Amino acid sequence: MKQAITGTIILALFIAVVNLYPRYQKKYEPPLRLHRLPPTLALEIMSVGNKELMAEIIFYNTEFYFGEKVGWREETPELRRLYDALNKATDLDPYNIDCYYFAQGALSWVKPAIPYLNRLLEKGLKHRTWDWYLPFFLSANYYFQLKQPVKAAEYLKLASRLNPRSSLFATLTARMFYEGNETEAGIAYLRSLIKDTQNPLLRKRLAKRLKALEAIRYLELALEKYESKYKQKAKSLGDLVKAGLIESIPPDPYGGKFYLTKDGKVYTTSKLAEGWQKKKNDPDKN
């Protein structure tokens, strides 16, 4: 009986600490910072010939920061610093796939970060010449964010050549370049990325974006039905509800509201965007 009471008390205390500590942390502790690393040459000297180990330490420190910052404290991560750390880690060890995968998962939907991210992936592609993931990531970045389908097709073709057994590339190629449906291509891309992502926090963030794209596609299909039925385009998403094609406008996982633009496209006030701090100094120069 005493053991049961003791166990209950311990469990209650544990639950209280787990729930109350984040509030205490947010109120009294300063925001978690990712400290800027010294130049790559200095890191190389500090590694004493163990560049791969130094790169791995930087990667795990960055991943821990991201998990603590986003998953536990629910604060906005310093994505520019995160990129800088991963860039220097791959300067030390350009074969480290963890850095490239993590960078793609964290930065690929932040449009101002794409030129930096692509340079990082290009660096990896020069060394990991057998790895189909890197041209696959580059293809997605050029298509979805930079709106350069020809460039995207080049990288997708390379990814297909490196991994000829995958049916994903045929699906993406059809949706990107023949059917012209960017939303469906994005859904296919995210499902593939989620399937292969090991980091649970990144998987959660990608799943959130997937949910948003699925909501957009749901509305796009309803708009197509409306136009087919009434021989005219809907003026607002509310018309879909009035016509009985959908019960209600789905919520945006990012907290915004979906709306219909003048040219008939579904957008959201949240822009599905993450933050990227602009700084005068380019971290690539270090």
Residue ranges and their predicted role:
Residues 62, 136-144, 168-181, 200-218, ...:
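TPR/TPR-like alpha-solenoid helical repeat scaffolds
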Residues 50-71, 92-108, 129-144, 165-176:
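Amphipathic alpha-helical repeat scaffolds of TPR domains
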Residues 34, 38-47, 75-95, 114-128:
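Amphipathic alpha-helices of TPR/Sel1-like and other helical repeat/solenoid scaffolds
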Residues 1-50, 71:
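Extreme N-terminal leader/anchor segments
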Residues 157-164, 174-200:
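TPR/TPR-like (Sel1-like) alpha-helical repeat modules
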Residues 109, 123, 185-286:
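Low-complexity, acidic interaction segments enriched in glycine
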Residues 78-81, 111-120, 146-155, 182-185:
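Structural signature of tandem alpha-helical TPR/SEL1-like repeats
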Residues 87, 122, 156-157, 191:
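Alpha-solenoid helical repeat scaffolds
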